[in-house]
């Protein structure tokens, strides 16, 4: 992702810079850790959500990591560890909790394959930004830089997420992918409401919850 320091007027920050209070990420690799994480996550009404996956060696993407954040906590759930992910998917499908993602479609595809349903309800910060004057495919790092003034290291973009153990650089990268999502959501949603465009984003998000979007035929 290129960090372009030049902003068009409509791409300026809508609010003053804030510091995200989210704690250091915790890697979840056993059932006890997952149970404790889910207990804390259930008290939140918004969940920052991202995944890491691999496509190169399989037709369908292989889920390698699920990152979930709240205002206070950040968890990296390891699907390659001996975990029952059923309770995690129940949480992701809980409609009392909004899931905040960036460029959500591929993440939703891999979560559908893993859990049998598309998480929801959704808010996609890339879609929201596009209705506020940003380029339609604005990257997460670029949006965070322009909107919040934070710099994100994207050096692990092409890393092998299926290898274990994860390196400290991978853990830091994965955590950064959710660390700013809740702040972005609050920022962008307020701007959308002010411009009368919040309904447009909600319609787009509702369409993303249709499982038919992610069904493919390997024969074609």
Regions found by a protein language model. Give the residues of each.
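Polybasic, low-complexity intrinsically disordered segments
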Residues: 1-3
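DEDD superfamily 3′-5′ metal-dependent exonuclease/proofreading module
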Residues: 5-6, 10, 14-220
